[in-house]
Regions:
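Surface-exposed, charge/polar-rich loops and edge strands
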Residues: 2-409
Length: 409
């Protein structure tokens, strides 16, 4: 059986474990950096400390790479005259399709959205009057084309305010469904990393929630290089694998942006690259496959450069990591661009060869999730369960607001 068939035939039931509800952290600790930290070096022993120890446990000359995306207030509620409430959950921009542009629109825009209670939305627009920046604004939502379980929704409004300010005024932070609670006022701060500044995600890159300005400053003191990238996290991050084998599970495409300067730093890195969170892992590892396409097709278009789900398992890896990264730099230079922007659908599962990172900081993930597959691919199929058993036996808190892990090769 070849590699891709082996990977596609992985049974998701092999990545199940018992997770009692009381082990799921419903809120973060008052002091983020006080959370517990499980450390594991592949082939070594498990140890534990606290997140404020991260600057001390990172290897010498490490490069810490984190995701600077910011969670948007993506949930909008419209109350109908009949009394029923329709919830619209903005997933990704359609028109304009550029994240920065769509937030700055001042009259209309279209998003791909999930619609809650859609059976109550028979026809016609939904409207509501809202207060935005001291102005009374009429916001209208029109339902368009259906795409799978989502709809294209066109929003239109008056008053000359931006769509970003509308979301800030009436939108809600979309906390994960497995918290089994509604959004609270504290989530608007708790569910953002201290370094988030690029609007676009509908879920936080939660490994970064533990960082404080003080922890980052201590990293600087110890000579740890800090760099950032962008992956806008989609709702697919909450989606469990429902098929028996992972080959039947389809990953969502997500927008990524990587500065040319980071690519150059990765090429010249003297120490290990440590990714903060699975979103940073997937973005960094996707770069190798972008560079691999450019090796044979230097003038590849956006579609050809999109990293597909099974690409790592079906394409021979014949060039070095540095060559792949240099190909991306050269591509940017030919196009006079300062950042690579594209999409990734990358699935990392056992059988995947990590090419760029040699360490990751991450949380404890849901049973039977693609994120658990990613961790298993890094620490080893035989070791992920021992790590999770240890965490369950030693009172670690799980999922988005829970405790953290540091894994290194």
């Amino acid at each position: 059986m070849n590699t891709i068939d082996k990977v596609r035939n992985i049974r998701i039931s092999d990545y199940n474990y018992p997770l009692p509800d009381h082990r799921i952290a419903k809120h973060p600790l008052a002091a983020r950096e006080q959370c517990k930290l499980l450390c594991y070096k592949v082939g070594g022993e498990i140890s534990e400390g606290h997140f404020y120890d991260v600057p001390a446990v990172l290897p010498e000359k490490a490069m810490l790479v984190y995701n600077n995306t910011r969670v948007i207030n993506a949930r909008l509620r419209f109350r109908k005259s009949t009394g029923s409430t329709i919830e619209i959950f903005c997933l990704e921009p359609v028109a304009p399709c550029d994240y920065q542009l769509i937030f700055q629109t001042t009259q209309s825009c279209t998003w791909l959205c999930l619609v809650g209670n859609s059976k109550r939305w028979k026809q016609g627009p939904l409207t509501q009057e809202i207060e935005v920046d001291g102005k009374t604004v009429t916001l209208e939502a029109n339902r368009g084309e259906r795409r799978g379980n989502s709809f294209e929704i066109e929003f239109s409004w008056n008053g000359g305010v931006t769509f970003a300010s509308i979301l800030e005024a009436i939108g809600e932070i979309p906390i994960p469904p497995y918290l089994n609670r509604g959004t609270e006022s504290t989530d608007s701060a708790d569910y953002q990393t201290v370094y988030s500044h690029i609007d676009g995600s509908v879920a936080a890159p939660t490994a970064g929630l533990h960082f404080t300005d003080e922890v980052l400053a201590e990293c600087d003191k110890r000579g740890i290089t800090r760099r950032e990238l962008t992956l806008h996290v989609g709702a697919g991050t909450f989606q469990p694998v429902k098929s028996e084998n992972i080959g039947e599970h389809e990953m969502h495409y997500e927008f990524i942006s990587v500065q040319r300067s980071l690519l150059v730093d990765l090429i010249n890195a003297e120490g290990p690259v440590v990714a903060v969170g699975t979103t940073s892992v997937r973005t960094l590892e996707s770069l190798y496959y972008v560079g691999q396409v450019l090796e044979t097709t230097p003038d590849a278009d956006e579609e050809m450069l999109t990293v597909k789900q099974w690409m790592p398992y079906s394409t021979p890896c014949e060039i070095s990591t540095k060559k792949a990264l240099q190909n991306v730099v050269d591509y940017l230079d030919r196009h006079h661009a300062e950042a690579y922007m594209g999409s990734t659908q990358l699935m990392i599962a056992p059988g995947f060869q990590y090419r760029i990172i040699s360490g990751m900081i991450t949380n404890f993930h849901q049973p039977q999730s693609t994120l658990l597959l990613l961790v298993s691919a890094f620490v080893g199929v035989d070791h992920w369960r021992a790590i999770y058993d240890y965490a369950l036996d030693h009172d670690f808190r799980f999922l988005s607001y829970g405790d953290a892990c540091f894994f290194q090769k």
